[in-house]
Amino acid sequence: MLFRSEIVVPAGDGAEAFVSVEDIAAVAAVTLTEPEKHAGRAYAPTGPQALTMAKAAEMISAAAGRTIAYRDTDREEWIAAMVSSGLPAEYAQVLRPLTATLASGNGARPNRDVLDVSGKAPVTFVEFAAKTAPAWK
């Protein structure tokens, strides 16, 4: 959640190998159009580098030309704030384990799924930040 030039999320110092929606779509498209080749396989596409939220905020700041800070917060307070902002309570509950995974660093191991399945290197976070910079201004 972006609030007053801050990314506020209960992630602590956990790292994540953030993956772009384009890369997820590329993997999905290949597996759906070549089902025999991918039958019985499971993929967990990742980006090429694991980053903490603080490092991600630094990269977004550089691309956007303004400071975007990361602020860790208490998970339960964050969920309550999301619900009070209009997020359905049922969906907010789904965020509890997702943010716990982020905080634990369980998603911090980049893999080759995007490259191996789609044939192209995954989008870097710097590329993502540059592409989405207008949204952060």
PLM segments and residue spans:
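Oxidoreductase cofactor-interface core, primarily capturing Rossmann-like NAD(P)-dependent enzymes
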Residues: 1-69, 73-85, 89-91, 97-104, ...
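Conserved active-site and cofactor/substrate-binding residues in soluble primary-metabolism enzymes
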Residues: 19, 51, 109, 120-123
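Histidine kinase transmitter module recognition
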Residues: 34, 117-120
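Short, hydrophobic/aliphatic alpha-helical segments
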Residues: 105-108, 130
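Short helix/strand-capping connector loops at secondary-structure junctions
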Residues: 107-116
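Amphipathic terminal alpha-helices
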Residues: 113, 121-137
